Amino acid sequence: MRECALTRESKPVAELLRFVVGPDEVIVPDTDAKAEGRGVWVTLGEKAVAEAVKKKAFAKSLKAQVSVPDDLAALARQRLEQRLLNALSMARKAGQIVTGATKVRAAVDADECLALLTATDAARDGRDKMASAIWGHDAAAREAGIEGRVTPHFELLSSDQLGLALGLENVIHAALVKGAAAQSALARAQRLARYIAN
């Protein structure tokens, strides 16, 4: 549990984002919470970080003069995106991600899909088809007596970003399939989605 510098609420670390004083006394995001030095924790959310900048919560929490970039919320989002891209690349190397509508659908039908990733610039009909495949599969699982089954569906990255991470061109649909590297990518996708939503 850590205290949010903005709201002063104690929250689990998973619900917070850490910032540290970097070179030249500038506040920088520490997305993995591993950097040395005293950190400042803020609720995991783009709006919360922007509000913390506006209210000078970093200087108040550190009790010191620090420089805070006006675009700190955007910088934190970029860092979270980069961590997701790195995790997706590792999942690809581990063989724990499939791409293309046909392979993704096969992973869903084989009950191997841990999460679905759709490019933010995908056509509406393609998005809808993949989403309905997931919903249909989850509904069938519930009918079979498997309660609480919800396969996450993320639209966080563009097709160019997905392609770059996976070493492919024009990636519109991808599915994380079961494995440790895929679990890591899923955790990073959930973290980024939470940051964007809040």
PLM features: residue spans?
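N-terminal cysteine/histidine-rich coordination modules
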Residues: 1-56, 60-64
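Helix-rich interaction surfaces within compact, conserved domain-sized segments
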Residues: 148, 153-198
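Short active-site oxyanion
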Residues: 38-39, 94-95, 113-115, 148-152, ...
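Positively charged, polar, low-complexity stretches
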Residues: 101-102, 106, 128-155
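Signal for well-folded cores of large energy- and translation-related assemblies
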Residues: 8, 81, 89-93, 108-112, ...
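Extended interfacial segments that mediate partner engagement and assembly in macromolecular machines
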Residues: 47-124
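Conserved nucleotide-binding/hydrolysis micro-motifs of P-loop NTPases
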Residues: 11, 47-49, 121-124, 160-161, ...
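Helical mechanochemical/support elements of P-loop NTPase systems and associated helical scaffolds
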Residues: 39, 54, 80, 100, ...
